[in-house]
Regions:
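Second-shell loop/turn segments in exported
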Residues: 18-24, 48, 191-195
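Short secondary-structure boundary/capping segments
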Residues: 35, 62-68, 92-99, 194-195
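Conserved beta-strand hairpin/beta-sheet module of binuclear metal-dependent hydrolase folds
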Residues: 1-43, 167-182
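Metallo-beta-lactamase
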Residues: 85-159
Length: 195
């Protein structure tokens, strides 16, 4: 299991690392980065990728990178078309009602022990730290759009309206790696957790 509800992935490239889906909160994402650095060395973050517009996939971004590095162009942030609109609509406009419903779904008001809450189904549970957002610098706008990120070739495929209103998947040619976001999972979490 991970440090948070979602999983953060770190991809080692030619000069540094790309962080995919930096968790729910900055504090938890920073702990994840510290664990990585302790075991793999202090490679710089050169890119962040948001697979989709749900808060558990971007909320910890400021625990991973400094916004000044993004503004200077030192770090690029990639996201699918429609990301900002979907993130705002879901997490600000509908956020209060979704948060209340999530309490029933996750049982986060239960005491965390063997007879109470032992997890949220998808992962441990949502962290309670600072939710952050840094706007994307690079938008993936079409299927088959290729981007070279830190020496690796990413072949993107948009999947809007699949698991989230704005979502994407990709293939990294050099690593023969497929990233399927939350479109391929062991759960049907958007079906049984209607919020």
């Amino acid at each position: 299991r991970n440090l948070d509800l979602s999983n953060m992935t770190i991809i080692e490239g030619k000069e540094g690392i790309t962080v995919v889906d930096p968790l729910v909160s900055a504090e938890t994402a920073k702990v994840g980065m510290d664990l990585y650095y302790k075991n793999r060395g202090n490679k710089p973050v050169v890119a962040v990728i948001y697979t989709h517009s749900h808060v558990d996939h971007y909320g910890g971004v400021r625990g991973v990178v400094d916004e000044a590095d993004v503004k200077s162009g030192k770090v690029k942030v990639y996201a699918p078309a429609g990301f900002m609109e979907a993130a705002v609509a879901e997490n600000i406009m509908a956020g209060n009602v979704m948060s209340r419903r999530a309490s029933y779904m996750y049982g986060n008001l239960l005491k965390p022990d063997a007879k109470g809450q032992v997890g949220a189904g998808l992962g441990t549970t949502t962290s309670a730290g600072t939710v952050t957002l840094i706007a994307p610098t690079n938008i993936i706008e079409k299927d088959g759009q290729k981007e070279v990120i830190d020496g690796l070739t990413y072949d993107f495929m948009l999947a809007p309206g699949s698991e989230a209103p704005s979502e994407m998947l990709w293939y990294i040619e050099e690593k023969k790696l497929i990233e399927s976001a939350e479109d391929v999972t062991h759960t049907l979490h958007n079906t049984y957790s209607l919020r």
